[in-house]
From Swiss-Prot:
Is probably capable of hydrolyzing cephalosporins such as ceftriaxone and ceftazidime, thus conferring resistance to these antibiotics. NCBIfam families: bla_class_A (NF033103), blaCTX-M (NF033089). Pfam families: Beta-lactamase2. This is Beta-lactamase CTX-M-97. Belongs to the class-A beta-lactamase family. GO terms for biological process: beta-lactam antibiotic catabolic process; response to antibiotic.
Length: 291
């Protein structure tokens, strides 16, 4: 639980700090980050999960990073990546057209609704899902793959034993406290996002496409991005659901520094609670200070 996560976090935060500092200074700085995250969480009235990976040395900053949180639309990254993986062996796959019917529309379809009685390519569906969080696009990607369990199977193929997708949009966003469906942990998601965008989980062309989609996201300006210097390049995917669940996962390219991978998950005790993107921005500012 939290004690284990904080203890683990303190060790990994310390690993990111310059070796010239005394151990006392290292401990003080690690404590400061943890105390700031704990204070932020306490003031919010919710539960906050954070995982940051510094790819310069693979050190980590973790807070409740091994606890499960509902992914909501951050799960769209896994579905889109699974389709990209298929395209490695079928160079024409992303041009495959998918019919869009009025009956396909769900609660949020800013792109798909413009194509009712027409078609969209799998590439267009991937872009709509990741850059506009289009729920019909996500459902079409899931259907193409063969169901939510196939998205989970793709995660397993990457070595991610934590991710699980059980439902489609919009029911995957219920975010009921204690419900394991459609959840992961901040650390598991951070490790997988790193593998997908900066590692070898995808071939170079597919990896570049995923990064391009994430950099073009239109929904994240008030979340992680809001807590970072404007000169930093960010690719991210947001998510939100019941219980005020507010999420963002990002790959960050600071100036003159190796990329950072950051996952921020937040949820609240009341089902009708409002989203709190400001909490994600504040968490991002805390954990990236000094980079």
């Amino acid at each position: 639980m939290m004690t284990q996560s904080i203890g683990r976090s303190m060790l990994t935060v310390m690993a990111t700090l310059p070796l010239l500092f005394s151990s006392a200074t290292l401990h003080a700085q690690a404590n400061s980050v943890q105390q700031q995250l704990e204070a932020l969480e306490k003031s919010s009235g919710g539960r906050l999960g954070v995982a940051l990976i510094n790819t310069a040395d693979n050190s980590q900053i973790l807070y409740r990073a091994d606890e499960r949180f509902a992914m909501c639309s951050t799960s769209k990254v896994m579905a889109a990546a699974a389709v990209l993986k298929q395209s490695e062996s079928d160079k024409h796959l992303l041009n495959q057209r998918v019919e869009i019917k009025k009956s396909d529309l769900v609660n949020y379809n800013p792109i798909a609704e413009k194509h009712v009685n027409g078609t969209m390519t799998l590439a267009e569906l991937g872009a709509a899902a990741l850059q506009y969080s289009d729920n019909t696009a996500m459902n079409k990607l899931i259907a193409h793959l063969g169901g939510p369990d196939k998205v989970t199977a793709f995660a397993r193929s990457l070595g991610d034993e934590t991710f699980r997708l059980d439902r489609t949009e919009p029911t995957l966003n219920t975010a009921i406290p204690g419900d394991p469906r459609d959840t992961t942990t901040p650390l598991a998601m951070a490790q997988t996002l790193k593998n997908l965008t900066l590692g070898k989980a995808l071939a170079e062309t597919q990896r570049a496409q995923l990064v391009t989609w994430l950099k073009g996201n239109t929904t994240g300006s008030a979340s992680i991005r809001a807590g970072l210097p404007k000169s930093w390049v960010v690719g991210d995917k947001t998510g939100s659901g019941d219980y005020g669940t507010t999420n963002d996962i990002a790959v960050i390219w600071p100036e003159n520094h190796a990329p950072l991978v950051l996952v921020t998950y937040f949820t609240q005790p009341e089902q009708k609670a409002e989203s709190r993107r400001d909490i994600l921005a504040a968490a991002a500012k805390i954990v990236t200070h000094g980079f």
